[in-house]
């Protein structure tokens, strides 16, 4: 009999360990019922908690599983402790029972004769087994028991609370005591005497709740119970023990009624009731000792709950009842199942032995299996239960850590790699202020930078140089490290189920956009958005690798990297992806970040990384960093034969919600997260031997984190044993705080520690340890490694580590991982020869890859060659530049690799035009072995299985097995029957063809030689494999039956048919095969062959007799022909070939479905094999070519020689098998040769049969050909930003003051409304607003038309500046005369173009401000009303007009002499003279169409880029102006005329516009009707030939009266005219008008700086300013090499245009090169397409790169159409 006892006590084992073990087992596929029960039990309790009153609900914190209750001591000792422990006990017992049944499937199967019993709450657990008709019912019935236990516990608490309320500040007191060695009747009599009826309330009486022969349990409210025990002499003298009963009274009939039972059971939502479950196993009542008579689940539950509430326990009755039952059944064996040893079970065991001595009784504990059977290496239950394997890592970390090995060297040596901020980020000399008083400056000079972060291989990643320069370097390096991590992980797309492109996602952490904000922002270009916005980082990785899974960019501040990894883990656990590429990125270039973090007191000012845990820790040191990892589910990684660097067991993120501020850490929340992650991972915190801390080196952060870590991993309550030391470390002390990459850096550090079996020394403590830390490190067994410490592997146990990572925004992320599994090879790879391949995208990288591999082999001479071959072929991407070699020895390989270095320059790319054509040639019988011993048959299961399938077909058709001729069971010279020999040949060839197909080698055309035609017809789809076997077998049988074996023979002669005829001397013979120009086979009788051999050899022709049984293709076969044709006619169906079929019978290529038939086979048996004419025909009709790759299918290469003799220039002809050579030697050589031709081989399939014997090697990563692509941040504009004098304090104070009213005393044509004015002492600010669509201003704009649009000319800006400058000066100095004003440093970053629809306003505002008018400066800025970003800036410098005139006097003579010179040149015809109409007509046709009011130039003389003009200003001034724009333009736009109309400029392709000037000043007013003379000479700048500078001198009566100095023009491709000068549409206008009210102009009076100087314009556009600092400017295309394209051809021009736009060289534009390889994407394609149309007249769509993906495609299209 089976008896299961459910105790009312927890097992003696640690409850944490029990629950943790159950949790871990539930993750595995072998325990589905256990997992379901735990889920159902948790759901049931959550449902009950949800239903609780609010005051009780508050007592239970949120939980995700019941394991958290075990760890919550406060909860288990709280008010609801009875309910909590009741649930935990039932869950432990039912889960242990279910898990035991699942792990011991042979036990506890038949419970029909079993019995159940329990004590206390254990009785409720027994109902789960009783109600389970089948094991599948256990989870639901068990969840019901858990639900009722909770409900009953809550109910008991509610009742008991009314009897005696508990003081939570005190320890809980017991409600029950067991009194030993007393008679129950005497005990009851004593209780009655002490509690007379009517004198003591019934509800307060002490009562007996359990009875045994020698003891009683007495229960009562704690104080009543304590008082009686102390008061009553009887109980005081007896020995009593307090029981751990703290939840209230049970077994109390005077307290509870049937209504209580009904409330608990009937009010519950029960699965058993819903499913109609009934008791099937008897449960013994602890009051009657008999099984309950319940018929339904509800009745059983009510019986049990009623007994627990109202009936006293009498275990002796249970024992008697069970013994009686055993006696009645006459059982001979009894197994007592329990959950740990207990007194009641021992009593039952004694009773059995006493009353039934013949009964064999055994005890079985259902708990130990949890610990004895650690989770087996079985698949997890689902993705959510999987462990996650890290299979590849790569990094770019500070200190030159470009590899993980170099990173480890930094850690191992204990280096601090902080240094002065490098110049490629910003000029620290101008951006540093140790006092912190200077605006926007950093108080630290130090960081931990990556060396040369701009290094990048743009062509490899299909980026043009122009795009690469713009793309954020952290995105570029994320792409590079992702490639390296995948490469080290052995990733090849679609190789396995887990590497399907649709199932791979990317997840990267990034918290800053420095490069976009500062470097890119200086010149916004086509790639500004895709090159800088964060989403494009992971998106670019997906796009490059063609991953179709999700891509996420994660920003959680400093925890971004690890949070991204955690989200990647979630995706794997959720089943969203099968492989995740993840990590973090951070490249620092923006000085604002340093200034802001300094102001927030985050950064250390010293020259150190991070002083983590140091007493003087004062903040962190900022750091660069890029880290990438590849993560899979563990079972997938193991199935894929990956290297497993570490295994992630759990990860989670939460928020420090209760912290004192958002940036302040919180130890409690950190500890909570750690416990939660450990619980989910099923890990005991004390088993974790290393924790990598965040450790930024801030006082607050270090203390809070250390407190949380100690609380969880090294607590005082449950201390670590001596053999459980815990070490802690923090990588930031070495490489600084990488912010968004910090967690990634920490994870990679831990992975390297696992690999190196060492804990590197901690270098953060520079003085002494933080005094706030607890002093009991030693007692806690907690250690900081001050020297490198061994971290050895422990047999039978895995090392565990945790990583803490926090974010300044309040986020906490924690991860727990263990070391990867150790995998041993099952057996050695049997192959003797292997292929090692090295490839790259360029020759330079190929050289680098070869050199790296040579260095690796020299450093690792014991490298397993099989592993190397596997890694370099099946586990690496194969690029277009290749070397591959078959070898059997590493030393030999090293020599071959070294030799190949000298040949790299001669190696061209393969596969650029697609893979080569493949042809299969099938060998005839002349090459077959008598008895083959095929290693392929021995070693390749798929080949062997296919041979067996074919052999089965043959035997089913009545033929003998051909296996003995293949498997080596006979000596090679053993001669089999013709049937076996011929079947062996055809089966081998069909199996070889299928094997080649599995390797990716499939024929495009076939030819068969003699008997090889049957296999060829099968592969071509003409006949089935079954028919091929039938045809060959029947033909062989007929030959055997009707022809005499060995009476005839065949002889190969190295001569042509004509030569044989000429030299045979008339000897009789039959031409059997014409194989080549000098290869012929004769057939005949042996005598005939002997006779003809003599003259042929005498003539010098080599003759070889073939070892064949019959003379095929001769008269010997005549007897079988009729029968053969008849049999095939009726038994074989011939289909149309699926590929060209080269017929050696007909000497031509067959495409139709009629030629190949039974008659064809008859003729092919008898007639000659015309291999030579067949091949010649195939060449003639281009069915094959010299580029065709030939694979010979047969036991020995024969046809390959014929093919090469017919087509000597054949690229490749290789064998499958070679006689007397190991198959793998032949296959390796052939595979290597095929690989070098570009055939897409399935290397994975090639190695798959041996993968258990192979391991992935960590070979050197790809040798990128890197260049430095970097946009340098220039100047110090980050310090100014146009708000240099902004004062937050003043702004706040002024906001509370009444705003001054703005007077309306200023209104001109350009300054329509003053909207803000404030003056304070010598400081002031004025803001105006004007509508471009109004009045004279609109007329002025439309008088200056470009591209058909009205454009606000710079002269309008000048009038506004002079107007506001005069106005502001008068307001500040009303009594002073307004001085002359020099408008300096005008910079227009974006033209203001008038919209077409004038009914909508187009408003802009201009601000003029000065901190101190005595400084002589007024700052100007122009903005649209809906945008605070200025589109123009300038500075007015106050001056003296007389001083200007004096300074110009010396120049007047020089200018006049140049004008005289131009006059002479014009007179001599050496300079051009233009009239007014000619000049403005030309100006209008080239760029600017001026209205008549602007047309002041009356004549122009121009030579090259030098000119003068006679100017007369219009006599009518329409509008109100300070200086009319018509006047300014008339005297100044000579410079624009020169730049756009001079023959020295290419006006057809380009146009020139001015972004501004250095100065504009007029010493005298410009007067209507007055005459002036303007002179200018423009010169190109040295730094940028597209930028020109010049000075425009304005003269009156030979005296300089005005000057526009340093006027700048920049040349742009005319194709961009539409982009920059197009009227804004209505939608934009409406949006601007609608948003105008939301933007409030700042009118804060500027604060005077300590030293006033002309400020740099805010955020200048480098495109317009001409100020560029690019280490790698786009290269100009070099002269193309000699080609068939003439210089003036459309093709040549098109290539030049492409090279120019892509920043490429023409030599890069080979026909086989794709646009994608050049990095020309859709954006650049649009620009190129537009230029094709406008400059070349070539009409192409914007999808150029899609329509013509390769240069050659585009060239051919141009040749055809242009």
UniProtKB/Swiss-Prot annotation:
Residues 17-247 are annotated as: N-terminal acylcarrier protein transacylase domain (SAT). It catalyses: holo-[ACP] + 8 malonyl-CoA + 8 H(+) = atrochrysone carboxyl-[ACP] + 8 CO2 + 8 CoA + 2 H2O. Residues 385-819 form the Ketosynthase family 3 (KS3) domain. Residues 1312-1618 form the PKS/mFAS DH domain. Keywords: Multifunctional enzyme, Phosphopantetheine, Phosphoprotein, Transferase. Residues 1671-1680 have a biased composition (Pro residues). Residues 1685-1762 form the Carrier domain. Multidomain protein; including a starter unit:ACP transacylase (SAT) that selects the starter unit; a ketosynthase (KS) that catalyzes repeated decarboxylative condensation to elongate the polyketide backbone; a malonyl-CoA:ACP transacylase (MAT) that selects and transfers the extender unit malonyl-CoA; a product template (PT) domain that controls the immediate cyclization regioselectivity of the reactive polyketide backbone; and an acyl-carrier protein (ACP) that serves as the tether of the growing and completed polyketide via its phosphopantetheinyl arm. This is Non-reducing polyketide synthase PKS8-1. It comes from Pseudocercospora fijiensis (strain CIRAD86). The gene is PKS8-1.
């Amino acid at each position: 009999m089976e008896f299961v006892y459910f105790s009312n006590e927890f097992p003696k084992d640690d409850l944490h360990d029990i629950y943790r073990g159950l949790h871990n087992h539930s993750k595995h596929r072998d325990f589905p019922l256990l997992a379901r029960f735990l889920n159902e039990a948790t759901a049931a309790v959550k449902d009950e908690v949800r239903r609780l009153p609010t005051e009780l609900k508050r007592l239970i914190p949120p939980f995700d599983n019941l394991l958290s209750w075990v760890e919550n001591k406060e909860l288990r000792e709280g008010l609801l402790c009875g309910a909590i422990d009741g649930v935990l006990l039932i869950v432990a017992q039912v889960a242990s029972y279910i898990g035991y049944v699942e792990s011991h499937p042979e036990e506890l199967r038949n419970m029909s004769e079993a019995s159940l019993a329990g004590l206390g709450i254990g009785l409720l657990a027994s109902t789960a087994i009783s109600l389970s008709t089948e094991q599948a019912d256990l989870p639901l019935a068990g969840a019901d028991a858990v639900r009722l236990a909770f409900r009953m516990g809550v109910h008991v608490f509610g009742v008991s609370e009314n009897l005696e309320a508990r003081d939570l500040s005190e320890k809980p007191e017991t409600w029950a005591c067991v009194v030993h060695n007393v008679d129950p009747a005497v005990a009851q009599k004593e209780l009655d005497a002490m509690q007379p009826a009517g004198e003591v309330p019934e509800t307060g009486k002490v009562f007996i709740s359990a009875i045994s022969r020698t003891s009683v349990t007495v229960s009562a409210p704690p104080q009543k119970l304590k008082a009686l025990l102390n008061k009553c002499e009887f109980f005081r003298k007896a020995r009593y023990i307090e029981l751990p009963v703290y939840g209230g009274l049970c077994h109390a009939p005077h307290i509870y009624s049937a209504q209580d039972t009904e409330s608990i059971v009937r009010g519950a939502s029960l699965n058993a009731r819903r499913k109609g479950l009934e008791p099937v196993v008897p449960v013994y009542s602890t009051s009657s000792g008999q099984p309950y008579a319940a018929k339904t689940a509800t009745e059983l539950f009510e019986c049990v709950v009623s007994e627990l509430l109202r009936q006293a326990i009498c275990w002796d009755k249970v024992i008697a009842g069970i013994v009686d039952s055993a006696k009645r059944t006459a059982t001979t064996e009894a197994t007592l199942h329990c959950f740990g040893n207990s007194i009641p079970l021992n009593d039952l065991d004694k009773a059995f032995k006493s009353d039934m001595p013949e009964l064999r009784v055994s005890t079985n504990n259902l708990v130990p299996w949890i610990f004895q059977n650690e989770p087996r290496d079985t698949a997890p239950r689902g993705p959510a239960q999987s462990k996650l394997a890290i299979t590849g890592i790569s990094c770019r970390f500070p200190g030159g850590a470009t590899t993980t090995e170099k990173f480890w060297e930094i850690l191992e040596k204990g280096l601090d790699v902080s240094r002065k901020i490098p110049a490629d980020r910003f000029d620290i000399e101008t951006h540093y202020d140790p006092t912190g008083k200077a605006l926007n400056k950093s108080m630290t000079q130090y960081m931990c930078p990556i060396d040369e972060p701009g290094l990048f291989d743009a062509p490899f990643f299909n980026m043009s140089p122009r795009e690469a320069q713009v793309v954020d370097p952290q995105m570029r390096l994320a792409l590079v490290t992702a490639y390296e991590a995948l490469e080290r992980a052995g990733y090849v797309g679609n190789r396995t189920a887990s590497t399907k492109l649709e199932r791979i996602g990317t997840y990267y952490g990034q918290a800053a956009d420095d490069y976009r904000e500062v470097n890119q922002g200086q010149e916004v270009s086509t790639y500004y958005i895709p090159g800088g916005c964060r989403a494009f980082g992971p998106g670019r990785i997906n796009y490059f690798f063609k991953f179709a899974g999700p891509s996420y960019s994660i920003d959680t501040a400093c925890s971004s990297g690890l949070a991204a990894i955690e989200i990647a883990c979630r995706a794997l656990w959720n089943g969203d992806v099968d492989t995740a590429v993840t990590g973090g990125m951070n490249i620092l270039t923006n000085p604002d970040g340093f200034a802001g973090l300094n102001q927030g007191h985050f950064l250390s000012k010293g020259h150190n990384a991070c002083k983590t845990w140091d007493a003087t820790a004062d903040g962190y040191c900022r750091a660069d960093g890029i880290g990438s990892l590849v993560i899979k589910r563990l079972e997938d990684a193991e199935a894929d034969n990956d290297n497993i660097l570490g295994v992630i067991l759990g990860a989670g993120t939460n928020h420090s919600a209760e912290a004192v501020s958002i940036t302040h850490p919180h130890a409690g929340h950190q500890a909570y997260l750690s416990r939660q992650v450990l619980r989910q991972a099923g890990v005991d915190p004390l088993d974790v031997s290393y924790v990598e801390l965040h450790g930024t080196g801030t006082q607050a952060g270090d203390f809070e984190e250390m407190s949380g870590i100690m609380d969880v991993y090294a607590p005082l309550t449950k201390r670590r044993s001596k053999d459980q030391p815990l070490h802690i470390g923090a990588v930031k002390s070495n490489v600084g705080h990488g912010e968004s990459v910090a967690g990634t850096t920490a994870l990679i550090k831990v992975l390297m520690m696992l690999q190196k079996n060492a804990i590197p020394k901690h270098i953060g403590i520079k003085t002494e340890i933080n005094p706030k830390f607890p002093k009991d490190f030693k007692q806690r067994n907690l250690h900081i490694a001050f020297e490198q410490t061994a971290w050895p592997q422990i047999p039978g146990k895995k090392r565990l580590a945790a990583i803490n990572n926090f974010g300044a925004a309040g986020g906490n992320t924690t991860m727990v991982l263990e070391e990867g599994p150790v995998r041993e090879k099952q057996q050695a790879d049997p192959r003797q020869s292997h292929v090692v391949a090295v490839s790259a995208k360029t020759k330079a990288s190929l050289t680098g890859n070869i050199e790296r591999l040579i260095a690796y082999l020299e450093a690792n001479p014991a490298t397993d060659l099989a592993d190397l071959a596997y890694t370099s072929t099946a586990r690496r991407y194969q690029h277009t530049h290749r070397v591959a070699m078959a070898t059997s020895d590493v030393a030999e390989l090293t020599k071959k690799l070294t030799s190949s270095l000298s040949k790299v320059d001669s190696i061209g790319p393969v596969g650029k035009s697609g893979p080569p054509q493949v042809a299969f040639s099938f060998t005839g019988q002349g090459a077959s072995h008598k008895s083959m011993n095929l290693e392929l048959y021995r070693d390749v299961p798929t080949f062997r299985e296919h041979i067996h399938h074919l052999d089965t077909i043959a035997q089913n058709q009545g033929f003998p097995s051909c296996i003995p001729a293949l498997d080596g069971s006979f000596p090679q010279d053993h001669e089999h029957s013709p049937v076996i020999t011929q079947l062996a040949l055809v089966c081998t060839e069909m199996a070889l063809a299928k094997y080649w197909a599995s390797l990716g080698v499939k024929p495009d055309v076939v030819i068969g030689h003699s008997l090889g035609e049957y296999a060829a017809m099968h592969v071509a789809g003409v006949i089935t494999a079954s028919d091929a076997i039938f045809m060959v077998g029947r033909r062989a049988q007929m030959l055997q039956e009707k022809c005499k074996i060995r009476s005839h023979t065949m002889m190969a002669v190295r001569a042509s048919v004509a030569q044989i005829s000429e030299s045979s001397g008339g000897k009789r013979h039959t031409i059997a095969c014409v194989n080549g120009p000098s290869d012929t086979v004769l057939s005949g009788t042996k005598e005939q062959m002997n006779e003809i051999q003599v003259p042929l050899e005498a003539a010098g022709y080599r003759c070889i007799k073939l070892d064949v049984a019959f003379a095929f293709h001769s008269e010997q076969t005549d007897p079988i022909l009729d029968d053969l044709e008849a049999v095939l006619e009726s038994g074989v169906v011939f289909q149309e070939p699926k590929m060209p079929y080269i017929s050696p019978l007909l000497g031509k290529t067959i495409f139709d479905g009629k030629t190949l038939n039974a008659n064809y086979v008859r003729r092919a048996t008898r007639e000659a094999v015309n291999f030579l004419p067949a091949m010649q025909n195939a060449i003639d009709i281009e069915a094959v070519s010299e580029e065709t790759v030939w694979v010979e299918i047969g036991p020995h290469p024969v046809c390959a020689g014929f093919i090469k003799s017919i087509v000597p220039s054949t690229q490749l002809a290789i064998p499958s098998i070679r006689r007397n050579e190991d198959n793998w030697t032949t296959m390796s050589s052939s595979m290597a040769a095929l690989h070098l031709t570009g055939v897409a081989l399935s290397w994975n399939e090639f190695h798959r049969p041996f993968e258990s014997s192979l391991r992935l090697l960590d070979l050197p990563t790809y040798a990128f050909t890197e260049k430095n692509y970097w946009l340098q941040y220039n100047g110090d504009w980050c310090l100014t930003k146009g708000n240099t004098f902004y004062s937050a304090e003043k702004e706040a104070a002024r906001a509370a003051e009444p705003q001054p009213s703005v007077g309306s005393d200023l209104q001109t044509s350009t300054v329509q409304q003053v909207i803000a004015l404030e003056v304070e002492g010598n400081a002031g600010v004025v803001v105006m607003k004007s509508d471009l669509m109004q009045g004279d201003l609109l007329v002025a704009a439309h008088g200056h038309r470009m591209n058909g649009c009205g454009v606000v000319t710079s002269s309008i800006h000048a009038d506004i500046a002079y107007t506001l400058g005069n106005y502001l000066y008068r307001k500040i100095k009303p009594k002073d005369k307004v001085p002359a004003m020099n408008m300096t440093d005008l910079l227009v970053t974006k033209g203001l173009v008038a919209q077409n629809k004038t009914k909508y306003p187009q408003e802009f505002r201009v601000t003029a401000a000065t901190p101190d008018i005595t400084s002589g400066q007024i700052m100007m800025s122009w903005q649209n009303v809906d945008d605070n970003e200025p589109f123009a800036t300038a500075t007015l410098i106050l001056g003296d007009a007389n001083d200007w005139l004096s300074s110009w006097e010396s120049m007047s003579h020089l200018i006049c002499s140049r004008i005289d010179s131009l006059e002479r040149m014009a007179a001599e015809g050496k300079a051009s003279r233009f009239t007014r109409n000619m000049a403005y007509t030309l100006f209008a046709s080239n760029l600017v169409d001026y209205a008549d009011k602007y047309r002041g130039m009356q004549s122009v003389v121009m030579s090259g880029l030098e000119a003068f003009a006679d100017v007369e200003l219009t006599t009518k001034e329409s509008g109100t102006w300070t200086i009319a724009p018509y006047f300014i333009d008339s005297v100044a736009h000579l410079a624009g005329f020169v730049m756009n109309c001079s023959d020295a400029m290419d006006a057809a392709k380009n146009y020139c516009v001015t972004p501004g000037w250095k100065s504009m000043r007029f010493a005298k007013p410009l007067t209507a009707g007055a005459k002036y003379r303007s002179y200018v000479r423009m010169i190109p700048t040295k730094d940028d030939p597209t930028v020109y500078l010049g000075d425009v001198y304005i003269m009156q009566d030979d005296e300089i009266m005005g000057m526009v100095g340093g006027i700048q023009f920049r040349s742009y491709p005319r194709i961009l005219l539409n982009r920059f000068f197009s009227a804004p549409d209505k939608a934009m206008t409406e949006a601007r008008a609608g948003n105008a009210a939301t933007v409030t102009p700042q009118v804060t009076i500027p604060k005077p700086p300590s030293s006033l100087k002309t400020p740099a314009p805010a955020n200048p556009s480098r495109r317009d300013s001409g100020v560029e600092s690019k280490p790698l400017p786009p290269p100009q295309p070099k002269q193309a090499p000699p080609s068939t394209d003439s210089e003036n051809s459309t093709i040549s021009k098109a290539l030049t245009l492409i090279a120019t736009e892509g920043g490429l060289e023409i030599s890069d534009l080979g026909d086989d090169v794709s646009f994608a390889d050049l990095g020309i994407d859709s954006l650049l394609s649009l620009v190129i397409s537009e230029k094709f149309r406008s400059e070349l007249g070539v009409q192409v769509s914007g999808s150029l790169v899609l329509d013509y993906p390769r240069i050659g495609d585009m060239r051919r299209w141009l040749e055809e159409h242009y």
